[in-house]
């Protein structure tokens, strides 16, 4: 019985901690959500442009290397 308790106790403690965390968390209000959404969209755009420009620079370099 002691071995079963040793096996189950970490899962039980994790579930208890998870429930406590979810109860303490609150949903963001509309203003906070919009701020987070805009920041995420700006980040996606910046990463997209960086990827685009890296690809744009590497295409001619690749053609020079392969074309030789």
Curated annotation (Swiss-Prot):
One of its GO terms (molecular function) is protein transmembrane transporter activity. It comes from Gryllotalpa orientalis. It comes from the Eukaryota. GO terms for cellular component: endoplasmic reticulum membrane. Residues 62-68 are extracellular. Belongs to the SecE/SEC61-gamma family. Residues 1-32 are cytoplasmic. It is a single-pass membrane protein. SUPFAM superfamilies: Preprotein translocase SecE subunit. NCBIfam families: secE_euk_arch (TIGR00327). One of its GO terms (biological process) is protein targeting to ER. InterPro entries: Prot_translocase_SecE_dom_sf, Translocase_Sec61-g, Translocase_SecE/Sec61-g. Its main location: endoplasmic reticulum. Heterotrimeric complex composed of SEC61-alpha, SEC61-beta and SEC61-gamma. It is found in: Endoplasmic reticulum membrane. Keywords: Endoplasmic reticulum, Membrane, Protein transport, Translocation, Transmembrane, Transmembrane helix, Transport. Necessary for protein translocation in the endoplasmic reticulum. This is Protein transport protein Sec61 subunit gamma. The keyword Lyase does not apply. The keyword ATP-binding does not apply. The chain crosses the membrane at residues 33-61.
């Amino acid at each position: 019985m002691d071995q079963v308790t040793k096996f189950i106790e970490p899962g039980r403690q994790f579930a208890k901690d998870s429930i406590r965390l979810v109860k303490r968390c609150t949903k963001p209000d509309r203003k906070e959500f919009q701020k987070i959404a805009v920041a995420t969209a700006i980040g996606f755009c910046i990463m997209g442009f960086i990827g685009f420009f890296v690809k744009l620079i590497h295409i001619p370099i690749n053609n020079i290397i392969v074309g030789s």
